[in-house]
């Protein structure tokens, strides 16, 4: 009986240590800044400005203020690794022709890999011209759960705080 108690105590100690150690590696959910609210689904969350509305379709969510202006779109697709090795050169070869076919001229493309709050993110940024309107786009591509999400912030007027806040609050629970 003493031996069983000893074994149980050791097992509980090991389980407790594992729980503590695994908790150390887990990213903490970021705080949502004042003036922002939370977009959240089963696999992903980030902050967007209060007062903006989120409308969800079959594979896209559009988040925007009333009227025309800056906006955020969230598009999801089946989990894929095709963006993991994305470079400016591969963007220009694979994706830029699609933008041009829609009448969008893209320039100043940058691609970076970043890790906000433990999430592996590919950041794709560019300047664009469409129908005479200048736009800046920053896309954050992140895989979580069974999906790969592309969060795109489109700016008709520069708003560095919007781009920064969306990025700094991306959370997948990793």
Predicted segment positions?
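Surface-exposed amphipathic alpha-helical segments
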Residues: 52, 147-174
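Signature of long, low-cysteine stretches enriched in small and polar/charged residues
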Residues: 96-143
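Bacterial N-terminal signal peptides that target proteins for export
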Residues: 1-10
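Short, surface-exposed coil-to-beta transition loops
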Residues: 56-60, 133-139, 162
């Amino acid at each position: 009986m003493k031996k069983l108690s000893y074994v149980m105590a050791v097992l509980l100690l090991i389980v407790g240590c594992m729980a503590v150690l695994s908790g150390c590696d887990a990213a903490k959910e970021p705080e949502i800044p004042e003036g922002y609210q939370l977009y959240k689904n089963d696999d992903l969350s980030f902050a967007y400005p209060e007062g903006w509305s989120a409308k969800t379709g079959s594979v896209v969510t559009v988040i925007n203020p009333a009227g025309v202006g800056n906006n955020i779109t969230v598009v999801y697709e089946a989990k894929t690794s095709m963006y993991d090795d994305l470079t400016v050169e591969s963007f220009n070869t694979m994706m830029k022709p699609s933008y041009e076919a829609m009448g969008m001229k893209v320039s100043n493309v940058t691609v970076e890999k970043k890790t906000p709050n433990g999430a592996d993110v590919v950041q794709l940024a560019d300047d664009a011209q469409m129908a005479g309107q200048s736009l800046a786009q920053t896309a954050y591509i992140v895989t979580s759960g069974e999906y790969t999400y592309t969060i795109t912030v489109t700016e008709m007027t520069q708003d560095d705080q919007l781009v920064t806040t969306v990025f700094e609050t991306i959370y997948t629970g990793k």
